[in-house]
């Protein structure tokens, strides 16, 4: 779950 969230955040940033 964490890796997915970090991936989304990095994508948004």
Curated annotation (Swiss-Prot):
Which terms under GO biological process does the entry name? defense response to bacterium; innate immune response
Q: What is its main location?
A: secreted
Which intervals of the chain form a coiled coil? none
Its keywords, alphabetically, are: Amidation, Amphibian defense peptide, Antibiotic, Antimicrobial, Immunity, Innate immunity, Membrane, Secreted, Target cell membrane, Target membrane
Where does the protein end up?
Secreted; Target cell membrane
State which tissues express it: Expressed by the skin glands.
Residues annotated with Leucine amide modification: 13
UniProt GO cellular component terms: extracellular region; membrane; other organism cell membrane
Name the family.
Answer: Belongs to the frog skin active peptide (FSAP) family. Temporin subfamily.
Its function, per the record, reads: Antibacterial peptide. Has activity against the Gram-positive bacterium S.aureus (MIC=64 uM) and the Gram-negative bacterium E.coli (MIC>128 uM). Has no hemolytic activity (LC(50)>300 uM).
The protein in question is named Temporin-1CSc
């Amino acid at each position: 779950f964490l890796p997915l969230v970090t991936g989304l955040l990095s994508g948004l940033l």
